[in-house]
Amino acid sequence: MKTRSEIENRMQDIEYALLGKALIFEDSTEYILRQLANYEFKCSHHKNIFIVFKYLKDNGLPITVDSAWEELLRRRIKDMDKSYLGLMLHDALSNDKLRSVSHTVFLDDLSVCSAEENLSNFIFRSFNEYNENPLRRSPFLLLERIKGRLDSAIAKTFSIRSARGRSIYDIFSQSEIGVLARIKKRRATFSENQNSFFDAFPTGYKDIDDKGVILAKGNFVIIAARPSIGKTALAIDMAINLAVTQQRRVGFLSLEMSAGQIVERIIANLTGISGEKLQRGDLSKEELFRVEEAGETVRESHFYICSDSQYKLNLIANQIRLLRKEDRVDVIFIDYLQLINSSVGENRQNEIADISRTLRGLASELNIPIVCLSQLSRKVEDRANKVPMLSDLRDSGQIEQDADVILFINRKESSSNCEITVGKNRHGSVFSSVLHFDPKISKFSAIKKVW
């Protein structure tokens, strides 16, 4: 965490930038003056300038260096020179970063700094109180208080960000992160590589990737199926495509299988040797060599398996944040949703709803796809064709609401072909694809055409 002086200096820099934009950009002025209050300013000069700008605006007077200086003199504020206003105007006009970065970005930064400062002050006071009476307070209670305040600060920061409205043009044109910039980069990526995955990742299945974008950054993706149909196999196969073929960083949180079991499935997938043969050790020299080669392949990849994951939602959320921060993962897989416990204990339906909302929020917050496996209710077993529907998602309709993409896997017991149905796609079309599935090696592949 930054020191308090570093936070204050950063806040004063942001105040300076915002007042400069208010001075030269009329479309920014009203918004900035409406969103801020004078007590939020750290620098007394900036606070006085803000008060004067607001007075001039409220009285229909132009906001210029001269008009602001005259009002400051009228209020007998003499601890600041007119040249400070002139420098503010000059920097706002000549600094490319100040001109290109939207005022809403600066406002967001200011709210984050404010939350960071409040949290820093709280931690400082809490440790002082604990050091004065170490025997009267539990260190675990202190940590719990800090954790609660941290969660509150994060929630407050994001609520402030989401509460601020932004014009359509601002969102469209904003510097390097606006909609126009993203569309141009997508076009450049498509022209260069003939694919549409600038801000998304291919699943590795051409038929699916040609029809729609599944693993877009920020997407909350659900893979749902009946037991023993291939949910975990599809997730592992997709993760291998990402980590090995595409050289992406992948996090896999398994609440059901051990790390060793997952790695054996990965080895079976890469070598084409059945999981049963690997378990028995019934391998030829050539097969053992293939296993060793697969080991070298995965050694070069960034595939992180967390099989000792706690079942509590808050601990899983912390683990995901840590994987993103420390290991810079691009995609997270969770196996599976119904094994997670939430502190909302009124009933299981409310628990699942809380879990779904939290994972959806994490995908958006961390700007990565989070793929979560889910069970289906027994209703699908009662239907003759056993084709899954959105209403079959187990325990909560909230999953259907929160998910950006929902994939269903359907396979007849006697068939080696699986139908992958996109039952929901918030940002694209729904469709179906058929893949070949080899359960012995947990591998999905395109169906070979017979000519």
UniProtKB/Swiss-Prot annotation:
Domain of life: Bacteria
Result for mutant: residue 188 to V: In plasmid pCHL1
One Pfam match: DnaB_C
Segment forming the signal sequence: none
SMART domains noted in UniProt: AAA (SM00382)
Domain SF4 helicase: 194-451
BP GO annotations: DNA replication, synthesis of primer
Swiss-Prot/TrEMBL keywords: ATP-binding, DNA replication, DNA-binding, Helicase, Hydrolase, Isomerase, Nucleotide-binding, Plasmid, Primosome
Protein's UniProt keywords contain Isomerase: yes
Record's keyword annotation contains Nucleotide-binding: yes
Effect seen on changing residue 200 to G: In plasmid pCHL1 and plasmid pCTT1
Record's GO cellular component terms: cytosol; primosome complex
Gene Ontology terms for molecular function: ATP binding; ATP hydrolysis activity; DNA binding; DNA helicase activity
UniProt-annotated binding residues for ATP: 225-232
EC number, UniProt record: 5.6.2.3
Catalytic activity of the protein: Couples ATP hydrolysis with the unwinding of duplex DNA at the replication fork by translocating in the 5'-3' direction. This creates two antiparallel DNA single strands (ssDNA). The leading ssDNA polymer is the template for DNA polymerase III holoenzyme which synthesizes a continuous strand; ATP + H2O = ADP + phosphate + H(+)
Enzyme class: isomerase
Subunit structure: Homohexamer.
Similarity remark: Belongs to the helicase family. DnaB subfamily.
Role this protein plays: A replicative DNA helicase, it participates in initiation and elongation during DNA replication. Travels ahead of the DNA replisome, separating dsDNA into templates for DNA synthesis. A processive ATP-dependent 5'-3' DNA helicase it has DNA-dependent ATPase activity.
Protein's name according to its UniProt entry: Probable plasmid replicative DNA helicase
Species per Swiss-Prot/TrEMBL record: Chlamydia trachomatis
